[in-house]
A protein has these predicted regions:
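A contiguous binding-surface segment within folded domains or other stable secondary-structure elements
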Residues: 398-414
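Radical SAM enzyme core and accessory elements
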Residues: 1-139, 216, 432-505
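Amphipathic, soluble alpha/beta structural segments
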Residues: 232, 237-241, 422-426, 490-505
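Canonical Radical SAM [4Fe-4S] cluster-binding loop centered on the CxxxCxxC motif
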Residues: 178-213
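Short beta-strand motif preference
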Residues: 53-55, 183, 299
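Flexible glycine/acidic-rich beta-alpha junction loops that bind and position SAM and/or redox cofactors
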Residues: 307, 311-312, 342-349, 364-390, ...
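Conserved non-cysteine loop/helix-boundary elements of the Radical SAM core domain that shape
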Residues: 199-399
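N-terminal [4Fe-4S]-dependent radical SAM core
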Residues: 99-104, 108-113, 134-181, 230
Length: 505
């Protein structure tokens, strides 16, 4: 679609909206020609009081229009956000004007639907709720603002209210210098068909694992020195991947020992290890986790259908998940998470129902329902694998929510990813008391996350504001291992951020 901007250059927000509203269109900025089938002209002007935007939208012979005005108040930074919002809202209103005019056949061919999340394009649909509650609004006022300001339907707004309220409760438990810790293990037994993460297949890169673990431990120890000297307090720890389960018991023990020796964990009630694929789980590894006081383990089958596991490149069967969960239960960890993905190749609504029912039967108290995200580097896209359509994914999710509620689960966090099937969300469900606070903290951007390991993204949050900065570790295990100076630079930036924006009082 050709985009023409007059009086502004809000490319990013319009491109994000375009991705949601017109999933098959790519943005271009060439001059509009009379024969063009898809184009939109967005014109903005302003007075001292407000920003006024108009949209003219042409799509395969159909035309639509929209207008929107947003007050301009507050700081220059706040006014920039108000301008972006006005442009995005105007584009969305033009789409709403266009949609009912289009024949059903054209909608189907172009994969056009009314977005279930309204005009929200970000990965954190409930963040406006948390922010509104922080400002003193009632839950009903916060939900109504989501519906009127972002055009979110009632059902999705109610879900966002539930998870956003948990985010607000998480915020109240945090103090100014509280942080979370993350350790990444970027290795997997094999690469799944849906995955584009920078992770190494162990069968191809086994020799990298041991030097990686040594470099990781060195980073953890230097990070511990930094955290102690700056009087920061860890509140949650999460080891993810990749698949941490590829580590040997000795390697797991060494990493967790370094964590305990480097950080004061007396105020850290949550220690999570996403051990991952069930075929990597052994009694010896679970014994190590138990000895280090791990409070939550994550077993991630993604599906309990064997033919779906084969289709996505997993080399385990559903029986391996059953065996792994029996082992996990024997060690009596306080909390157990399981992950499922709706929309996998070869899956059906009936198969997804069987998978969810089996996870509930196996005793998880925390179940995350992901929706398949079509990532650019994944085998699904590169090989054109067939996946369930949006209606099938909707049927899967329509079964999940009431089934989990009936089993005593409530939603406690949600987030979106780009290129996600049907513009749905990932939702974390838990029984009361089973929430993973690290997940809430990172999805709601409530506190800084200090990340260790290759590809780690350290997020620095100024409490009580929207000011967030990031530094990134080197992506690949080999370059991470060979270039420790990058770690030193990132830790120096972390210290500088806290000295500048979160000084000790």
């Amino acid at each position: 679609m050709k985009l023409e901007f007059l009086g502004h250059d809000e490319r990013y927000i319009v491109e994000q909206s375009l991705m949601t509203l017109f999933p098959l269109e790519k943005p271009t900025y060439d001059a509009v020609q009379p024969e063009d089938e898809a184009w939109c002209r967005l014109a903005a002007g302003e007075t001292a009081a407000d920003c006024q935007v108009s949209a003219e939208l042409h799509y395969h012979g159909y035309t639509a229009a929209g207008t929107f005005a947003s007050p301009l108040t507050g700081t220059d930074f706040e006014k920039e956000g108000q301008r972006r919002y006005a442009v995005a809202a105007c584009f969305y209103l033009a789409f709403l004007d266009l949609y009912p005019k289009l024949p059903e056949a054209l909608r189907a061919a172009e994969k056009l639907t009314l977005p279930p999340g309204g005009m929200l394009t970000g990965v954190r649909p409930d963040k406006p709720i948390t922010r509104a509650l922080m400002e003193g609004k009632t839950p009903e006022e916060a939900k109504q603002e989501l519906k009127t300001r972002y055009f979110v339907p009632e059902e999705r707004a109610a879900l966002a209210l539930e998870t956003g309220a948990v985010g607000y409760q998480a915020l109240k438990r945090l103090e100014k210098r509280d942080i979370d810790l993350y350790v990444g293990i970027p290795f997997c037994p094999t690469r799944c068909a849906y995955c584009s993460f920078v992770s190494q297949s162990v069968e191809r890169s086994f020799s990298l694992v041991e030097p990686y673990v040594k470099a990781l431990i060195a980073e953890i120890r230097s990070g511990g020195d930094m955290v102690r000297s700056n009087r920061l307090r860890p509140r949650a720890f999460y080891m993810g991947g990749g698949t941490p389960g590829i580590l040997t018991p000795d390697q797991m023990d060494a990493i967790l020992t370094a964590l305990e020796e480097s950080f004061d964990l007396s105020a850290c009630p949550e220690i999570t290890v996403e051990i991952g694929r069930p075929d990597t789980i052994t009694a010896e590894k679970l014994a190590v986790l138990k000895s280090h006081g791990v409070t939550r383990v994550c077993v991630n089958p993604q599906t309990m259908e064997d033919h779906v596991l084969a289709a996505i490149g997993r080399r385990h069967a559903s029986a391996d998940t059953v065996r792994a969960m029996e082992l996990v239960r024997a060690y009596r960890f306080p909390h157990v998470n399981m992950d499922l993905i709706a929309g996998l190749p070869a899956d059906t609504p009936e198969g997804f129902r069987r998978s969810l029912d089996k996870c509930l039967e196996l005793g998880a108290d925390d179940i995350t329902i992901h929706t398949l995200a079509l990532k650019k580097g994944s085998r699904i896209l590169m090989e054109g694998l067939s996946i369930p359509d949006g209606a099938a994914v909707q049927a899967m999710l329509d079964y999940a929510a009431p089934t989990l509620r009936a089993a005593g689960f409530v939603p406690y966090y949600l987030y979106r990813q780009k290129y996600m099937s049907g513009s749905f969300e990932n939702v974390g469900w838990s029984r009361p008391g089973g929430e993973c606070w690290y997940n809430v903290d990172i999805m709601s951007e409530l506190c800084s996350i200090l990340s260790f390991g290759a590809g780690g993204s350290t997020k620095m949050v100024e409490p009580g504001t929207n000011h967030i900065e990031r530094v990134f570790n080197l992506k690949y295990p080999k370059e991470y291992t060979d270039r420790p100076e990058k770690i030193q630079q990132n830790q120096a930036a972390f210290v500088e951020f806290y000295q500048k924006y979160v000084p000790e009082t």
